[in-house]
Structures are given as structure tokens and as C-alpha cells.
From Swiss-Prot:
Keyword terms, alphabetized: Chloroplast, Electron transport, Membrane, Photosynthesis, Plastid, Thylakoid, Transmembrane, Transmembrane helix, Transport
UniProt subcellular location: Plastid, Chloroplast thylakoid membrane
Entry protein name: Cytochrome b6-f complex subunit 5
Keyword Ribosomal protein: no
GO cellular component terms given for this protein: chloroplast thylakoid membrane; cytochrome b6f complex
Organism in which the protein naturally occurs: Pleurastrum terricola (Filamentous green alga)
Amino acid sequence: MVEALLSGIVLGLVPVTILGLFVTAYLQYRRGDRVTSSF
């Protein structure tokens, strides 16, 4: 049961992480490299 819960958490987190990376890269590409120090 723990493995199923862990795999569900991983399968839920991986697309969100990839989507977040794409969104941040897209926003930095749109605005130029002015906002690289905002994190």
C-alpha cells in the first residue's frame, strides 16, 4: 500500500515539476534574462 501511495505521489509530482520548469523557462524567454535572480 505504501508503494502505491508513493508511486501515486511521484506520478503526480513529475508532470507538475516538468510543467513548472517549462513555465519558468518560457517566462524567462519572454522577458529576457532580467528575472534570473528572482528566485
